[in-house]
């Protein structure tokens, strides 16, 4: 039995939101390397940082899409483009999100609403729109980006933690309803990963020392650690896995 042959997505169509940098970029590249054509959900369609070009250089197709998840009209327009160009969608990686830092007493209603609209509402309605393709196809793979912050409390990030906990449970709800359509819905929950979003925080030696003291493996993750898990969950190798959240936290949450 050739197990490695099952970790591929050859010929599939995948949408990755928040694809321009960090984890989204790594996921898009991993899926393309494994054989998928990629629709790139971007907050600014003109700023993909060369990602579409890189994917096309692999011999895969790339479709940049304007997709600010706080704007429902952009979500609808993006799916119209997916229908026009591909008329099908096999894989969705709900990566786009925001992580504002603010103590609870300083959180404004606008802060609260915006974080929920991108992280939770956006994930819900992107998945719902994907379902229109996947239910008809009787096939789909949805992978949501939660966080270890959905399992532990991080001071100064109450709203973010709440949304990531919500994504973990939203994952179960979608999985429960859509399993009968051969759609699996899972999530990954990373710890601190070296990305543009964590670069400034981890550049502070005290911050880095604190993070490393919490991680059992005593190392900070790389984007490929998350991308490899996403690829696995999107592949035939994970066809019997649904409704689960895979912690990629180096052991932080076991202590």
Give the role of each language-model region.
Residues 1-8, 152, 230-231, 242-255:
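Short C-terminal tail/terminal secondary-structure segment
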Residues 13, 20-21:
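Conserved glycine-rich cofactor-binding loop
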Residues 36-50:
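Conserved glycine-rich Rossmann-like NAD(P)H-binding loop of the short-chain dehydrogenase/reductase
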Residues 147:
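Residue(s) in the substrate-gating loop at a strand-loop-helix junction
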């Amino acid at each position: 039995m050739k197990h490695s042959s099952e970790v591929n997505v050859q010929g599939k169509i995948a949408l990755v939101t928040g694809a321009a940098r960090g984890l989204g970029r790594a996921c898009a590249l991993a899926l393309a390397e494994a054989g998928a054509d990629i629709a790139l959900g971007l907050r600014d369609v003109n700023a993909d940082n060369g990602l579409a070009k890189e994917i096309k250089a692999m011999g895969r197709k790339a479709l940049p899409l304007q997709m600010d998840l706080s704007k429902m009209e952009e979500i609808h327009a993006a799916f119209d483009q997916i229908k026009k160009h591909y008329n099908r969608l096999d894989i969705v990686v709900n990566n786009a999100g925001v992580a504002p830092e603010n103590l609870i007493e300083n959180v404004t209603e606008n802060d609260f609403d915006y974080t929920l609209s991108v992280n939770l509402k956006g994930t819900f309605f992107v998945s719902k729109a994907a379902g229109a393709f996947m239910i008809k196809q009787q096939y789909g793979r949805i992978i949501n980006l939660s966080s270890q912050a959905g399992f532990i409390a991080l001071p100064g990030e109450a709203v973010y933690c709440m949304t990531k906990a919500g994504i973990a449970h939203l994952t179960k709800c979608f999985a429960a309803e859509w399993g009968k359509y051969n759609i699996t819905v899972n999530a990954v929950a990373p710890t601190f990963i070296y990305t543009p979003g964590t670069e400034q925080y981890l550049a502070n030696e005290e911050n880095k020392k604190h993070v490393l003291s919490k991680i059992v493996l005593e190392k900070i993750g790389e984007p490929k650690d998350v991308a490899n898990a996403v690829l696995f969950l999107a592949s035939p190798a994970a066809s019997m896995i649904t409704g689960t959240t895979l912690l990629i936290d180096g052991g932080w949450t076991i202590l």
